[in-house]
Amino acid sequence: MLQTAEAPWSQAETQSAHALFRKAYQRELDGLLATVQAQASQITQIDDLWKLHDFLSAKRHEIDGKYDDRQSVIIFVFAQLLKEGLVQAEELTFLAADKQSKIKALARL
């Protein structure tokens, strides 16, 4: 069961959190795909290709590190996803009010 320092996560919260993580991940990948398609259509030189490669390498590292659902960081991950617009505050209603408040506060930092 997922936990924060304040309160344990219920099974329903845990399942909903995983579902929202998957949804946010897919949103990010969809956006990345659109960006890459647009950039790829503009490639005219080999330097453009290497820039796209560097961009993709950096994005892969960023994305691989972002979607971490370990108990110790899950609140922070949701705050980051909220800050980046990959999840909306309304999508966090499956969480207890104290957890929602903490995520929203962290997203404002």
From Swiss-Prot:
It is found in: Cellular thylakoid membrane. GO terms for cellular component: plasma membrane-derived thylakoid membrane. Probably a dimer, interacts with the C-terminal domain of OCP-R. Disruption phenotype: Decreased fluorescence recovery after non-photochemical quenching (NPQ). Induction: Transcribed from its own promoter, it may also be cotranscribed with upstream ocp. Destabilizes orange carotenoid protein-R form (OCP-R), the FRP-OCP interaction accelerates the OCP-R to OCP-O conversion. Increases fluorescence recovery following non-photochemical quenching (NPQ) by OCP, most probably by destabilizing OCP-R binding to the phycobilisome core. Changing residue 60 to K/L: Almost no conversion of OCP-R to OCP-O. This is Fluorescence recovery protein. It is a peripheral membrane protein. It comes from Synechocystis sp. (strain ATCC 27184 / PCC 6803 / Kazusa). Changing residue 54 to L: About 25% conversion of OCP-R to OCP-O. It comes from the Bacteria. Keywords: Membrane, Thylakoid.
